[in-house]
Amino acid sequence: MLAADTNVVVRIVTRDDERQALVADAFVQKGAWVSQLVLAETAWVLRDLYGLEHEEIASIIEMLLQHESLTLQDADVIAMALEHYRQRPRIGFSDCLVLEIARKAGHLPLGTFDRDLSKLDGAQRLL
């Protein structure tokens, strides 16, 4: 299976460069793997560079989870992170993802200085 980089995923969802979007579609057509890091970068790019709102990003992540040609690394972890992200708009998707990665690995609590993140089950505020 091939693997897709962040810019490939961004082109698939934004379609802001139709030529690149078509090439990205063709690249993933037979199946492509998307790492957790690529997904976290995609959420950041969509928020900071494209100015998308929280729920728009959540909907895109949901769409990627259901995309017929994409296999997301640890989709169960991503789904749980997405659930936290939807419930707590002040917490970034990458923070939610870090917590769920730690949970799956059996390494809780997740120590953090982030007030909002520490409100989630499994996270512990250090100060």
Which role fits each region the language model picked out?
Residues 1-34, 50-56, 127:
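Short, well-structured N-terminal submotif of metal-dependent ribonuclease cores
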Residues 43-47, 62-65, 82, 99:
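Amphipathic alpha-helical segments within well-ordered protein domains
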Residues 1, 99-127:
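Acidic, PIN/NYN-like endoribonuclease modules and their adjacent C-terminal/linker elements
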Residues 69-111:
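Active-site neighborhoods of divalent-metal-dependent phosphate/nucleic-acid chemistry enzymes
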Residues 10-12, 46-50, 68, 85:
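Short amphipathic alpha-helical interaction patches enriched in hydrophobic/aromatic residues
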Residues 4, 19, 34-37, 52-59, ...:
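Alpha-helix N-cap and coil->helix boundary residues
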